[in-house]
Curated annotation (Swiss-Prot):
Organism from which the protein derives: Pseudomonas putida (strain GB-1)
Catalytic activity: oxaloacetate + phosphate = phosphoenolpyruvate + hydrogencarbonate
HAMAP family linked to this entry: PEPcase_type1
Protein's recorded name: Phosphoenolpyruvate carboxylase
Entry's Gene Ontology cellular component terms: cytosol
A matching Pfam family: PEPcase
Enzyme class name: lyase
GO molecular function: magnesium ion binding; phosphoenolpyruvate carboxylase activity
Keyword terms, alphabetized: Carbon dioxide fixation, Lyase, Magnesium
Amino acid sequence: MTDIDVRLREDVHVLGELLGETIRQQHGDAFLQKIEDIRHSAKADRRGPGEQLSSTLADLAEDDLLPVARAFNQFLNLANMAEQYQLIRRRDADQPEPFEARVLPELLARLKQAGHSNDALARQLAKLDIQLVLTAHPTEVARRTLIQKYDAIAGQLAAQDHRDLSPAERQQVRERLRRLIAEAWHTEEIRRTRPTPVDEAKWGFAVIEHSLWHAIPSHLRKVDKALLEATGLRLPLEAAPIRFASWMGGDRDGNPNVTAAVTREVLLLARWMAADLFLRDIDALAAELSMQQANDALRERVGDSAEPYRAVLKQLRDRLRATRAWAHSALASNQPAGAEVLVDNRDLIAPLELCYQSLHDCGMGVIAEGPLLDCLRRAVTFGLFLGRLDVRQDAARHRDALTEITDYLGLGRYADWDEEQRIGFLQAELKNRRPLLPAHFKPQADTAEVLATCREVAAAPAASLGSYVISMAGAASDVLAVQLLLKEAGLTRPMRVVPLFETLADLDNAGPVMQRLLGLPGYRAGLRGPQEVMIGYSDSAKDAGTTAAAWAQYRAQENLVRICAEHQVELLLFHGRGGTVGRGGGPAHAAILSQPPGSVAGRFRTTEQGEMIRFKFGLPGIAEQNLNLYLAAVLEATLLPPPPPQPAWRELMDQLAADGVKAYRSVVRENPDFVEYFRQSTPEQELGRLPLGSRPAKRRAGGIESLRAIPWIFGWTQTRLMLPAWLGWETALSNALARGQGELLAQMREQWPFFRTRIDMLEMVLAKADAQIAEAYDERLVQPHLLPLGAHLRDLLSQSCQVVLGLTGQPVLLAHSPETLEFISLRNTYLDPLHRLQAELLARSRSREAALDSPLEQALLVTVAGIAAGLRNTG
């Protein structure tokens, strides 16, 4: 065990000890002993038959349910924070830098060895276009209040690490930790009400303010340093290889709470926040830049001022204050922006560049390269809007709106027309100079909302908006329909309208749809920049299982690369990944390097979801590491793409996908008991009551198809069966081995990044799965006639584990990563009581109608949050 591991264990021990002291102070020694007994029972059950813990928990008095659940939940959150801090802990001089810090310098060295010139490397790095899209899917269980306390705890762990602390200072740190842990313990874990879409957007702004605002300039300093050392060239000031966008306040797909008014409010809040953040920077810079000497360009701007830099910054500060004041007042009224309000990012960047260049010209480069450069990097990356807001809506809503319009105009029903009729109508109207809608048209509420959203898009500054994403897109007309509605709303500038292909059938049809669209007269001429296409991971996996979905996603991307090349159109692929393997999640670095050759051509757009935003970007140091990984992976996939898969690999993957989807659907769609079993064995129905996000957990009607991908995954994750992430693989891989294709599978795993990444992610999720825990839920919750189905699914889980072990040649899952295995083992001691307690609470809750704010229901919600924290993902 390394010294680093020892320090992590020490941190976890200290945090656990302080939590125990806090619990003792509120509940007494006897209760704390009860917690210890439960923990020891959990350990004993892992070694024995596994009945001690369940009987201990079944005997708990009603009043003990909530504090017991809270104790284990709090410990897992504290362990998470210790692990997160461990990732960014200062290394001693004799310890190697972490992979995340080395990845870019080592990649640049490899690229030079591969024959890339210094100029080519610098040029490609400067023009990288990586967009991380923050989304508010309801997977962030922890409250923002608690997250801030956990972040403060990380700060005290860092303070504790300083070697030169006096005993008194060390004691002060310990007292601060004790106080923060007490504050967390005495704070409710669960929101009493659902957040609004505006609350979610504010949470996104908080991630930028507290973490990304600091991480970006630090990350770009290191990129600049690595590039300079490798090539002798600098990263240009105008380069922003990574930018941010958001769906919070723009994603109205299935969420009636996201209205046109909400989108307008979120856009204004973003402008207010951006102005406020830049004002803080400018105030600090004005205090520093007191120098008198300036170049001619700056003097021309401010005359003979004794403090020319402060004079320039004062002008910018006045405009930022005017912008902030206007955004604040515009939230309450439709007040138009005055001339002083900043709208163009160049008006923010130019004064900063002027100061930077003047300082260099006057021999004060060391000052220019300080906080001024950091502010400039922020201005280029975040701009006046922090990031671009995407709009997303279901294709059916646009079809319904156009149907009402054509019906009103006496043209027939748009919904009843075939694809050629729709395209003919849409193209003719797009060319037509007259409005489509008469002024006196009074649409139904749903159509009125679609049109109002389009008007907000048309009215907003171009730089504040990203893409208009069409979910469940299935035809070229779906794209033209949005273009027509935007034209009707008064949009005169180009905007990316992005089809999202989600189901297995839609992914298979993505190529033909885009072939038709790009072949339409005038369509390509209207493109400004690349054609963006979104690939959906969540719904395709729920529809067909991850075996078939992963291959369909890969093939769809290959087809899109080929078709766009044929039409001489640049392609930007937008990856709609979730946080879990069942929704396309997994380590970003490996995922990017496993994309089809040519699909990452210097551009990459992906969603970052829910609790994964906190784990990957919640602390500046960790955010910086993840930004490094994204940048290095996109650069490598662009300049050193993997070779295309061999025909034999493709053929076997076709067969694996066919066997996988058949096995998956035979359980999920064809077994008449499956839906009932799912609802009884998991907390799926109770999750609908959890005030997680602003979006409803179900679509309007139906069975499994109506469930959104997130509660579908969330339910199985809570019981540790993890079914959506592996079901289908056990049959597909077993069949391949039975056909004597073991050597070919081994070759694919060794030589094909796509297949290796799939198997690695499968192994990770199987290591987190736990048949014993899943069985405990069945024993407590499932009616006798459904128990055989649960046993069958656990047999399939065991089969999955065995076939993966056979493929990897390891004695146990994750044998190659003992540290990860140790983390899982450590967490199980605290997760097991939460799982068993959750099953007990579900049984009690279902046997009687409990009020949402009763101790029983509150305890149930705390177990949900604790398990999500312990597994580091939810949906």
